[in-house]
Amino acid sequence: MTGFLSLRYITITVGLLVGIGTALFFNAGTLFAQITPPFYSIEYRPYKGPWMQLKTSHFRIIYPKGLDSVAYKSGRILEQQYPLAQSLTGGNLKNFPLVITNYSDLSNGFVQSWNFKSEINLAPIKGKALNPRGGDWLEAVLSHEILHATHGNIKGHFLLNSFGLLFGPDLTRSLNFYPPAGIHEGIAVYHEGKNSLSVNHGGRGNYGYFKAKYWANLLSDSPWSIGDGLIPTEYHYPLNRHYIAGYFFTEWLQETYGEGVLKESLLRHYNRFPLGLGVALKGVTASWPNAMAPVYRKWALDNYAIAHRARNKTQIDDVDYINPLNKELDQRRPLWISPTKLLYVERKPHQERGIYLYDTETQLRRLITSDFFVEDYLYAVDLKSKEIIYAAYKRGATSFNEVYSYLYRESFLEGASKKALIPGSKRMFAPSVDSHRNSLWALKNYLNIAQIYEYRNNNWLQCSQFKNTRPIAIAIHPSMKNTYAFLMQKRGFQGVWFVNNINSCSEIMSSLGGAADIGFDNASIIDIQWHPIKSTLLMSVDDRDGVRVVEYDLYNGQAFVKLDAEFAAYEASYSEDGKLFSFVDEQNQKNIIAVVDSSRIAANSFEWPTMNAIEIEKSSNSVLLGNDLLNSSTNWKIDSYTDDRSWWSPRVILPQIIDQSSFGSEDFSELEVGLFMQSTDILQERGYRFLGTLYRNNLWYQMSYSTKKFRPGIDFTFYRRPNYFIFSPEEGASVDLISDERGWSLGTPLSYRFPSLTRFSSISITPLLYVEGLRYIDGSGSFLSDYVVQTKYGLSSFLQLRVQQLTRDIQPRSGFITFISSQKTFKASQGSFTLNNNRYTYRLNDKYAIYADQKMYLPVWKKKNISILANAVILKQSKNLLFSTNNIRSTGFYSPVFPNSSYIGRFSTETIVPIWYADQGFFTVPSSLKAVYLKVFTHRMYDLANKTNIGYPTRTSFGAELNILFNISNITLSAGFGWYYDVLEKKSDFFIGSF
């Protein structure tokens, strides 16, 4: 499902590895620094008021002050749904945290296994992603997420559960998240239609818009296999296919093998998790997935035939499609601006989403604007000013979780001025132009619903005071004055309310407060659009098994089905003169806009009776989920949320085994062993990491505490870590020693994120202070000297400027990334040590280092997602080196590159050529193949400290690597093999790995 995420997985990605490498570089004891990635990110939350908590029998609901009614409603929904969810998954919950936030308009809900909790944004999902008959936002999202929560806490054999005592609770619990994501989402979507609203055909399993995408693929030449449908896709449409196929596979399993099949299989998987869910299903059903596949496909085909056999499908000839040759396409919302020209929204895998102008006569199109549009894609056309008005999301400056919608104006004339923000439009969406009142109407997020506003005379006025009704869209007749249609959801019903003769926007509540004027039995109206001339309203109506285009005549009260396509047709509109008719046609892996002569549509229409007033009233008053707990919930108590001390105990404990042979000295080749521990509080505003190890008869440690309970936050670290170095007591002699570095560091991260979500820009600056004592140790671990204290200060800065990475990009296709770090000691220090009865004096000279890394991404062939990275790096240090020169060196050289130089530069290029976007899943073996790509690279190193008559000394290497992205369970991995050539050494070699 596009709109809210339901799971967070810990994934091993290239980005994560880069992050670890960065952490290693900036610890002086590079080889001994933490090698375990942080499992819990520390987050700054924009809400800084008091947090409250409501405790129920099984849940702990944490929310901003003032949202008590939302918390109680959430608690009742969760408690009512808990036994239903438990019966499907078998998992148990106790004191499970749910965090509710209201500082984002981007709808989201998820359950995470690491720091086990659920979190939802109050902003309801926009657009068509959820079945309107499933109730309001809280009912939909909570009844979905509770399935993930119970699934995530399945307990199996005692032996496996006891690992929680050894390795922390989160590592053990994460075993439940190893099955394919489509199983997680499939069973949750299945439950949406099995909760107490199922009698009203709620949930996406009873939603034709959702099911049409599956059926379009099922009847195509390339249907998804079981494995394909259960893995998330990053490269092919629809991007939510694991929700869709996961639901159908779950429904088939439950129908074929009984309601307990997944519950038993999930428990069996937990106890045998390395074998995967396919083997677990075999143990329960006695059938391997390859034997299930033909039976499952036949069931799906029969399911489609039964659902569609009574439908009167529209047969239309001479249909023109926009970009019909594209295999994968997402086109939405055609709106006409003349008899032959229309605007529409489009996205392809190699391009961002934009609003385009299309001429039906010339078949030429032109991009008007691109942005991160609100997902209902509702925009308005102002024909007087020749402008479009649309809603787009922008990021907050302080937190990734802070996202708000705004309204913008932009001319659709060629060469016109750029877009302009409409004042006061924060959190608004779904605009509609009222040419009769010279005003603009829009909706504004309000908790889990929305309110109606009008912008007139440069002022916004609130026009509604809804509590249990959510407006979806506003349609204003372009030629008939005082004729308004409001598409709204009221409980499990979604229909149309008409309003006439408005003098003040506040008058609309007298018409909108009652029952709807139009509705259809066991169906939902999901979008509306007026005829430009006539008194008829076009509507897309979802009737559980498909989406039809229906036209309603305002004067005679009759509704006619104008179009019933093979799978789904929606978002229809007439041209300015009414002669042409456009709609979105659902096809395999694409939504494509069709244009046809309107007379051909009229010839195939047939009447569809609307509901009467009594039926509408009854459908609009379904009981809220959890309403049967109204009385008992009065015993639940609200108090202030305060951190309990449970987060002090580690949430994850992992053994550490570090091979120190990388020191390069046989005398010091030995395993360093120890433990890594980490934890965080529920809100993830603060946390700690601890790494303790034993090496050379000494205890080494690194204890870090981070907090972002205030801005900008602090990072504080105590450490004792070793660093290897070579001491030369006399000419031609050398001794290997270890420097024992003990101290603390303090950093204050200052960051700012720019608002664009289509091209990411941010800046981060972190001042650092180190106070460190240094002494020397011999190979046996004996101390040779006392500590000498040295103080260092540093500055780390990170800039990302207009970085863009689209659906099929392996690396960013454009943008700049700059990383600069510097360190400098305050003053020189002096010490001494004794070795072989000789006393040596050493001086820690005043040292400094500046590391600068500039990356520039450039598109080579946008349509094929081919891009190049140009990377320039310098490392300038004092003569007494502060950092190892290996930090700037790239793999591909046979021997050390300028190891003693104080000023080194490197220029590299990496060209990424995607070869195959596989997106293939394997169900019996818990794995999937994501993509295969070629990387061609060049590296040139410069010794900038030693210029000669012919220039700077250089070293060059080049090569290529074939890389494979794949998943084992839900862990993303990268493997490759390649070849490189060292020009100076005149040697080449093959390698296995990835760099």
Residue spans of the language-model regions?
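Juxtacatalytic substrate-recognition/specificity segment
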Residues: 33-174, 180, 197
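Outer-membrane beta-barrel translocator/channel fold
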Residues: 570, 588-590, 714-766, 772-785, ...
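A flexible loop/linker signature enriched in serine peptidases of the S9 family
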Residues: 201, 205, 327, 346-355, ...
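Beta/coil-rich, acidic/histidine-enriched accessory regions frequently appended to metallopeptidases
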Residues: 38, 42-43, 51-53, 265-386, ...
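C-terminal outer-membrane beta-barrel translocator/porin domains of Gram-negative envelope proteins
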Residues: 718, 723, 729-731, 782-929, ...
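Acidic/His/Gly-enriched intrinsically disordered linker/tail segments
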Residues: 43, 115-117, 133-141, 149, ...
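Residues that define the transmembrane beta-barrel architecture of outer-membrane proteins
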Residues: 669-673, 696-701, 738-746, 785-795, ...
